[in-house]
Curated annotation (Swiss-Prot):
Known function: GTPase that plays an essential role in the late steps of ribosome biogenesis.
Domain of life assignment: Bacteria
Domain EngA-type G as annotated: residue spans: 3-167, 176-349
Assembly and binders: Associates with the 50S ribosomal subunit.
One of the GO biological process terms: ribosome biogenesis
Positions contributing to GTP 2 binding: 182-189, 229-233, 294-297
Binding site for GTP 1: 9-16, 56-60, 119-122
HAMAP family per UniProt: GTPase_Der
Lineage, top ranks: Bacteria, Pseudomonadati, Pseudomonadota, Betaproteobacteria, Neisseriales
UniProt source species: Neisseria meningitidis serogroup C / serotype 2a (strain ATCC 700532 / DSM 15464 / FAM18)
Single GO term (MF): ATP hydrolysis activity
Protein name from the UniProt record: GTPase Der
InterPro entries: AAA+_ATPase, G_ENGA, GTP-bd, GTPase_Der, KH_dom-like, KH_dom-like_a/b, P-loop_NTPase, Small_GTP-bd
Region Disordered, annotated ranges: 435-485
Family listed: Belongs to the TRAFAC class TrmE-Era-EngA-EngB-Septin-like GTPase superfamily. EngA (Der) GTPase family.
Amino acid sequence: MKPTIALVGRPNVGKSTLFNRLTRTKDALVHDLPGLTRDRHYGHGKVGSKPYLVIDTGGFEPVVDSGILHEMAKQTLQAVDEADAVVFLVDGRTGLTPQDKIIADRLRQSPRPVYLAVNKGEGGNRAVLAAEFYELALGDPYVISGAHGDGVYYLIEDILETFPEPEAEEADAKHPVFAVIGRPNVGKSTLVNAILGEERVIAFDMAGTTRDSIHIDFEREGKPFTIIDTAGVRRRGKVDEAVEKFSVIKAMQAVEAANVAVLVLDAQQDIADQDATIAGFALEAGRALVVAVNKWDGISEERREQVKRDINRKLYFLDFAKFHFISALKERGIDGLFDSIQAAYNAAMIKMPTPKITRVLQSAIERQQPPRAGLVRPKMRYAHQGGMNPPVIVVHGNSLHAISDSYTRYLTQTFRKAFNLQGTPLRIQYNVSENPYENAEDKPKKKPLRRVSLSNRIEKREGRKEEKNRFKKKTKVSVKKQFSK
């Protein structure tokens, strides 16, 4: 699995800026107001062939006993427990503060490796900036600049050196590898028990650490499956809800290692933002998805209609996924769930012939042309498959940058229906034919127009008249000579 790096530090030391640098995005809000990043934010990064996950935590206020800052501190401690490495960020301009010392004391108690990074070090003397932070006893400080990127590469390179090279992904397996994901207490443990059997689960519960993730191979109705069982989703005991509700690292890691994700929802609870967040991770990773709405047997008909309305409203972006209304405790609906897992896997791994893809594209264009963007109408010529898990269709043509999102959705639905792509995301990429004269500098230079003055034009005209007169005189002379002879 990808190593997870947690960014920890007091408010306004530049964690969100460093997060943006490491993930090459601007997903985390960046502002000078201390404490702006309220909850943990997650992103993907890669150095060479080594991918990683980054957690952008809220500002660490360990001395506060109540209020939102206290909740942010608890989330940070949870992030430290779940991460594989911790980057402790301090402010090189402000210098060492008492709060930095308190945070360092907490981090020294953690079994995770801690890397001390002195941020905002651009333009300064590195030795001078780092000197006072040796007092924290966290090793040699890295002087970096999250805003400008100075020293960031060496920091991440040193962190990733301690982790092995990534092995071939389990997602490339020749059979469904699925992970059961979802919020706490929605019935993931009960579903895992229903799938594997109580004794098998208890045996695996006895081994491993809180960071272990177990791959269990099994067969159902003669078909092979592998379930990714993340530690801590079964019998964790009572966990602080304020911390646990933001814990999605295990879900992210499980999704990365699987080729199908099974999202479990609780029919007895309202659809929460965290449900949509976890579903979004699976969608962003391009994984096939099956949704299991658990505890369906314990609610009234009126509540069932309400749940369906909430799903349509809050999980509208999962229109490609198959929803199953099950009871894991009574093992109802499990067979249909496995049928959808197999179908979603088949759709994610489908191989589509190029001629058929192009025919479907041309048929879609005949039914509905892409709308104009100003004076330009996009022209799509042909398409082919560009990848699997998820399926990718690459469309070639001209002016494809002008294709609207609504038309892309139209093409997506058309391809999905033509190839029966149920349960998997489908991505469409536009490959625009290059225009060699796109840049003004590359255009062939036109010869400048010659501006001829009026006097020059008159002289040329007079010269032509004189030449005509001379020609006429010569003609008359030659005619006279002929007659004289």
